[in-house]
Structures are given as structure tokens and as C-alpha cells.
Amino acid sequence: FKSPSWQQGGRYHSETYACVFELPNGDKYVAYRGTDDGGWIDNGQGMTQESTLLQREASDYFDQMAEQYGWTESDNIYVTGHSKGGNKAQYVTLMSNHANLVDECHSFDGQGFSDEAIQSFKEKYGEEGYQEVLKKMYGYNGANDYVNPLGNTIIPKENMKYIDTVPNPGSGFDKFAGLHMEEQMFQRDENGNAIAVLGEETEQGVMGKFSAFLSEFLMSLPPEERDAAAMFVMQIMELRDVGEGGGALGVDGTSLTSGDIYLFIERVLPKLLDAMLEEVLEKFGLDKEAAERLILLVKLWMIFASGKWEYKLVKALIDELKERLLEL
């Protein structure tokens, strides 16, 4: 364990959080941590922008380590991470200045990329070269993980595995969040402690498929609507994740705007409900009336769901409405 990013003289944001592990046999692993305070906003930006601040910092960190330790192509070098960390590892494998040194990328629940990012990858390598780099990438995802389907998945299907996971005990958001916890992907010893062996391989679960459906819908939107929707959803996750003691801004100071809220409610939400209705009709063969009742139940759940972020969101909407009324 050496050269952690948080000991580099303030060169990197705390959210970058990376370090190098060197094994006795000389193999080197560069590991990136997943989302923390400010990172959810960066996740949203990753669905609409060519690159994000945290992706670029992850790449910079890898290049710094490669130059500092004089790594060459004769070294065995692996990049890895969970969630946002997995996304960073993928980005490093493609876009770092020393990307040619990466032998393999192992992403755990790491999300995909925007159309704009993929275009930049292809511009750098050409189509054939891009496909060749992707062969280095391997994905390990919880069967019902809801993060890895976000954006455009670039890891080849033949290199992707879904792992049977157990949700957190309890109910509500905590149980839901457990579907994305890395420790749930590993087997347990007789004392219930996680060991360094992945759980049984399985197929993608219902929640994972539903997240993939939502992501496909989101990525099909015009850029302005896609940006508003991504910011809306990720702002909710940011508020929920940091709680009362944290902030609600991205690492670059970005946050949800009133324009994002307006676009999401007026243009994106109706399209989403229509898409969900069509999906229900197609997948389950329900008649339209039955499908509409199901959609109504989802809407009612959203309205009456309890929690601090819902209160903050409703308050923000009310404040926005008051401001608009005062302008009339």
C-alpha cells in the first residue's frame, strides 16, 4: 500500500481517493474508491459529458504513479474499483496518457459512459483499436445492482458476470442500498465475515433489468432533457447519501437548478411514465387499464414516501413555485 491520493499535497479532491497496492510478486494494483460526498453529481455529469472532473483526476493519478515509479509494459498492472471507482478504472484504461501500461481493468458495479465519452474514445483509438482496448475490461456486478446499468455499458458481454447478492437487513432505502454494497458480492466465513471469494454467478435480476430500462430511456432523451434528468436523480442520491451533516454540491460546485427541476417535471417525467406503461404492457401482457393502475401505485408511492430527501425535494419545488407566482 503506497502513495495514496490524499497524501499528494492537495493535488486531488477527496472524492478521487485512490492508492497503489504492490504484491510480493511485483504485480501492481491501482484501486479507486466509489462515490462519496459530491460524487453523485459527478455521476450524473458522466451520463451527459465527454468526461468529468473525477474521471480526469483518476487518469491524472494513474499517470503520476506510472511516472513516479517508472512503470513499463513489462510490469503487470491492474486497475480496479467499485461503483464510481469502477467507472474511473474503465476511464483510466482508455484515456490516461499511460493507458498502454494497463494489463487488465476489473470493475465492480461500475457504471457506463455518455455518448459523448464513447465518441472521444473512438476518436483516440479508431473503431478497431477501441474494441481491442475493451477486451482488457472485466465487470463483476451484483445481480440486482442498480448503478452498473447507468449510461452506456462498454465492457464486453462475454467479460461481464452477475453475482448473487443478499440485500441489507431491514427495509426501505437501507435495504435498497444494500443491493449496491460491494461486501454483499463476496462469500462469508462461518462467522459471517466477508472473504475474498465472489458469490455464486447468476443472471441479472429484476432490479438490475429495471435500472437498465431506466438508463436506456434516459440515454435516449435529447441532451438538454438527459442532463436535467440525470441531475435531478443524482441530486436526490446526493442528498440521501450525505445526510444532514454533508453538502449537496458536486465536487466542482455544481448542483440541481430550478431549470433542471422544471424540465424534469414538465418534459421528462411524462415521457418516463409513458415508457414505463409501454414496458409493462409489453413485458407482462397487461391490458392498458391494469397497467395504468400499476403506474398510479408507483406515483402514489413516490408522493407519500417518507424520508429527509423527499422533504427537501418537495420544499424545493414549493419554493420554486412561490418564486414563479411572485413573478406573475
Name each model feature, range by range.
Residues A89-N97:
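Short glycine-enriched nucleophile-adjacent loop
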Residues K2-K28, Y32-N76, S96-L328:
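Alpha/beta hydrolase fold serine-hydrolase catalytic domain that processes acyl esters and thioesters
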Residues G81-G85, A89:
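Gly/Ala-rich beta-loop-alpha elbow adjacent to hydrolase catalytic centers
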